[in-house]
Amino acid sequence: MKKSAPGIACLLALPFLLSGCGAVGSKSLSLSVIYAVSSLLAVGILVGYACFSKKLKSWLLMLLVCVTVVNTGYFMLSVSGSLEVALWSNRISYLGSVFLPFTMLMSIMDVCKIKRPKWMIPVLLGVGAIVFLIAASPGILDIYYKEVTLRIVDGVCVLQKVYGPLHSIYLYYLVAYFSCMVAVIMYARHKAHSVSISYAVLLLIATLINIAVWLLEQLVDIEFEFLSVSYIISELFLLGVDILARSLQNQ
């Protein structure tokens, strides 16, 4: 435990350093640089976990993959230069965003030691695919965005959007997943499973924070995707908690 303590402390401290970077929005530092750093960090965390973790957790690994895809999309959008490339970049970011809550729910179910029915994963993946196709429709259909144009703000490409009739479906999708996570944790407590409820709750809190950040971006006109930083913070936090939990188990 003593040997791993410095590494745990560093890992848990990194989110606070990153959160300070997330507030940077001045013209002196291009937002594209922040997106690039977030993407590289996501790749580094993914590779580091895949290569150096003694016991890989498949759903946590998939979560890291999703965050890498999201942040790559954000970076590509910021340097896109044309509406067509920007829309494809937006689709890439949504590809990761749509399946991220799925990996969180699966992780919580694993932590709570709740068996999944065979139909669950295919059905949830199917629902996620439908939501993704709706979110990826701008430029083809006007159901998610009625109108979308490309603007350049302080040298960074951003999409100017007018929301369509099905834009709210993504919010309902997130709320449904969050409700399922709460239900899983409550069920595990009721059944008194021998599990780390506290770890599951931390996963739930990380999900809630990211949903809150997404809602803030929808309600307030902000030219920076704070989720790119929020996801990295969540990754590092969850990895730190995972390392700490394993260290305590090995005592």
How does the language model describe each region?
Residues 12-17, 36-48, 125-136, 178-183, ...:
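Hydrophobic core of alpha-helical transmembrane segments in multi-pass integral membrane proteins
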Residues 193-251:
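Interfacial "cap-and-anchor" motif at the non-cytosolic start of specific transmembrane alpha-helices
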Residues 1-20:
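N-terminal secretory/membrane targeting signals
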Residues 15, 19, 44, 99-102, ...:
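Alpha-helical transmembrane segments
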Residues 26-40, 51-140, 171, 227-232:
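Individual alpha-helical transmembrane segments in multi-pass integral membrane proteins
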Residues 24-38, 133-184, 217, 221-227:
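Extracellular-loop-to-transmembrane junctions of the mid-late helices
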Residues 50, 75-82, 105, 111, ...:
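Transmembrane helix-loop junctions and nearby membrane-interface residues
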Residues 49-73, 91, 125, 160-219:
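Alpha-helical transmembrane segments of multi-pass integral membrane proteins
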